[in-house]
Amino acid sequence: MRILKPYLRSTSIQCYLCLLLNSHFLTEAGIHVFILGCISASLPKTEANWQYVINDLKTIEHLIQSIHMDATLYTESDAHPNCKVTAMQCFLLELRVILHESKNATIYEIIENLTMLANSNLSSIENKTELGCKECEELEEKSIKEFLKSFVHIVQMFINTS
């Protein structure tokens, strides 16, 4: 099972600060490390994790077919691009229903990993309020198969805008 740690990017800044505090800043190499560290801290974070989210969703779909689960979930089928963060948060909440209904250890691990990946990607997006978006409970209830198909569509919206 792969577990990605998207929070490791911030540790490089801590390393640079440690170098600075240990008086390495006075050497030419220390100055180069400090300047490169400042530049790398300002670079945008790559969002390659969305493809892993899609892969995890496909794995969940295959596992659910094997255990014959037939729950209905609140599903955003035609999300407006301005509401994609709200839609993603609803999808992540509904994943908890799959987790509860399946009681499968493999599905549990995949959903935990998927949630971590999606939340790390969402954390890099500005926290802006999306007006006019539907609440999760206002969405239509659909089958798990339809839910996962719509979930992949929302993830692709994030991939296309990054």
Curated annotation (Swiss-Prot):
**Sugar-modified residues:** 104, 113, 121, 127
Sorted alphabetically, which keywords does the UniProt record give? Cytokine, Disulfide bond, Glycoprotein, Secreted, Signal
Q: Which cysteines are joined by disulfide bonds?
A: 83-133, 90-136
Q: Which Gene Ontology cellular component annotation is one that this UniProt entry carries? A: cytosol
Q: Please tell me where this protein is predominantly located.
A: secreted
Which GO BP terms apply? cell maturation; extrathymic T cell selection; immune response; interleukin-15-mediated signaling pathway; lymph node development; macrophage differentiation; natural killer cell differentiation; natural killer cell proliferation
Put simply, this protein is called Interleukin-15
